[in-house]
């Protein structure tokens, strides 16, 4: 950690697109007469499969946009009808967050208490529990390919999924790319993201490709084009697997962590949360939220609370649910504890 660190109708649409493609491919082959009068069969025109797929995706996206305009969201969307409260970390690490720092049973008891506090603080909005697991983690060592990141083992991922299912919680898989990039890392999670209860987080702090530095030495950055890649990646999974919308979380605690935010292109198949990720005293945290989230809105907002770092110096304290609900505008729909 850097010391300054203070997402039915779509299925029908897909079938329509597939049917149109099938009809085109099954048309009789045209023929023409040769100079001798015999028929010469023309070879079938080559099909640009990538173009066809893009057209189908565009058709599906337009259908999604139409539904969203009429109803405000797609069927099965979690936001804004819930407040997500998450425990963050890695079950194999005591140093990455509350998820993994304490024995499982002890952590789950604490989680139940936190969930109850949030539900009591705002009875009007149901609380959705979540585990937010760092699944691809930035590393201090380069690794075999020099990219400074490591993916959790399958057994770790499956155990984390099991923990989430025990709590009827959704699961976020968080990605720290190091010197790699999203196009190389996100496809590794495709099979997991086909699960409707699994969502995605991306962390610009550890995106170092444009910084030419090892993770932890500088604060990394993403541009709108990187966020758009993640949105499109998730939207494709939603469409191809007939899923409810996915949630994408983008962490942020400095101006430079996200550039050109106005160029982010929202898609109704993906619900985007900008998560204010800094630690420190409540005044600093609220100021950072105002500067980097409230003043640069994208869609939905999130706020992180640190069990250790927010109380590091007296009289600092861990903000209560009531404080978060009454002192932040817009009120976060995602609250994360690390």
Q: Where in this protein do the model-derived segments appear?
A:
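Catalytic domains of carbohydrate-active enzymes, especially glycoside hydrolases
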Residues: 71-133
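Substrate-binding cleft of extracellular glycoside hydrolase catalytic domains
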Residues: 117-119, 126-205
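Structural preference for beta-strand elements that scaffold enzyme active sites
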Residues: 84-86, 126-132, 170-172, 197-201, ...
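Bacterial N-terminal signal peptides that target proteins for export
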Residues: 2-11
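Surface-exposed substrate-engagement region within the catalytic domains
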Residues: 217-335
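Bacterial signal peptide processing site
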Residues: 25-27
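C-terminal motif of bacterial Sec signal peptides marking the signal peptidase cleavage site
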Residues: 20-23
């Amino acid at each position: 950690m850097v010391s300054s660190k203070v997402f039915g109708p779509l299925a029908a649409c897909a079938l329509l697109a597939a049917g149109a493609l099938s009809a085109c491919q099954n048309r009789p082959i045209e023929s023409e007469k040769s100079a001798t009068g015999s028929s010469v069969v023309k070879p079938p025109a080559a099909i640009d499969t990538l173009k066809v797929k893009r057209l189908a995706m565009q058709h599906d996206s337009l259908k999604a946009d139409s539904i969203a305009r009429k109803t405000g969201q797609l069927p099965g969307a979690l936001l804004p009808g819930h407040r997500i409260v998450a425990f963050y970390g890695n079950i194999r690490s005591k140093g990455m967050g509350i998820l993994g720092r304490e024995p499982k049973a002890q952590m789950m008891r604490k989680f139940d208490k936190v969930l109850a506090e949030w539900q009591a603080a705002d009875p009007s909005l149901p609380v959705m529990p979540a585990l937010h697991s760092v699944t691809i983690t930035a590393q201090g060592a380069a690794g075999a390919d020099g990219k400074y990141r490591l993916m959790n083992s399958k057994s770790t991922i499956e155990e984390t999924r099991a923990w989430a299912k025990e709590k009827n919680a959704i699961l976020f898989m968080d990605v720290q790319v190091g010197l790699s990039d999203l196009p190389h890392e996100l496809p590794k999670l495709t099979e997991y993201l086909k699960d409707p209860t699994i969502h995605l987080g991306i962390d610009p702090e550890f995106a170092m490709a444009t910084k030419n530095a090892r993770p932890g030495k500088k604060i990394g950055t993403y541009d709108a084009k990187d966020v758009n890649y993640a949105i499109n990646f998730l939207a494709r999974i939603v469409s191809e697997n007939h899923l409810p919308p996915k949630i994408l979380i983008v962490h942020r605690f400095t101006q430079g962590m996200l550039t050109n935010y106005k160029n982010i292109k929202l898609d109704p198949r993906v619900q985007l949360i900008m998560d204010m990720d800094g630690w420190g005293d409540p005044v600093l945290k609220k100021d950072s939220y105002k500067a980097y989230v409230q003043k640069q809105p994208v869609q939905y907002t999130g706020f992180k609370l640190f069990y250790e770092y927010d109380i590091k110096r007296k009289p600092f304290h861990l903000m209560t649910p009531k404080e978060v609900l009454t002192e932040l505008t817009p009120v976060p729909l995602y609250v994360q504890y690390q």
